[in-house]
Amino acid sequence: MVSVSKYIIDTSAMLSQKSDEQYRRTVYRSLWNKIDEMVQGHEIVTCSETASEVQDDDIKKWMAVQGMQVLPIDDEVQDNVREIVTTVNKDLVDFKANKSSGDAFLIATAKKYGLTVITEESVNSPRKIPMTCQKMDIKCMNLLGFMEEIGMAL
């Protein structure tokens, strides 16, 4: 069902619907209703590493209720991850932390399927998704950019 997918969403963007976040669902109902619709239609997906990063029970439930398509990690994605962490952006993963970074897998999956990344991470940090996407010519946007792209006016 990847053929209909257009976007891959990061944990930071998913979390932004929480009541204490910038794009809280109680205020941005139409945005989240549209995202719900696009997740249900598999236009917005995520990858298994990003899904496993989600610790928030409300977001886990939201993903399940919406039927979030979670793309698996395969050899091509692994190869893309290797390229990202060894040549494109060595700062993306903190190897001293001794844990996997869902960010590299998210970007690698976006590259494989030609997806646009949706994230709320800072565009100015070298350890963040937007900088790496820029280096790899992968389209990346925050939720405001997403709203503009789909023509949503509040």
For each feature predicted by the language model, list its residue ranges.
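Short, well-structured N-terminal submotif of metal-dependent ribonuclease cores
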Residues: 1-46, 56-63
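Acidic, PIN/NYN-like endoribonuclease modules and their adjacent C-terminal/linker elements
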Residues: 2-3, 122-154
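A generic structural signal for short hydrophobic patches within well-formed alpha-helices
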Residues: 14-15, 51, 146
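PIN-domain endoribonuclease scaffold, especially VapC-family toxins
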Residues: 35, 44, 48-97
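Residue-level detector of structured alpha->beta connecting loops
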Residues: 43, 67, 111-114, 137
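Residues within well-ordered alpha-helices
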Residues: 59-61, 106, 129, 143
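Active-site neighborhoods of divalent-metal-dependent phosphate/nucleic-acid chemistry enzymes
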Residues: 76-131
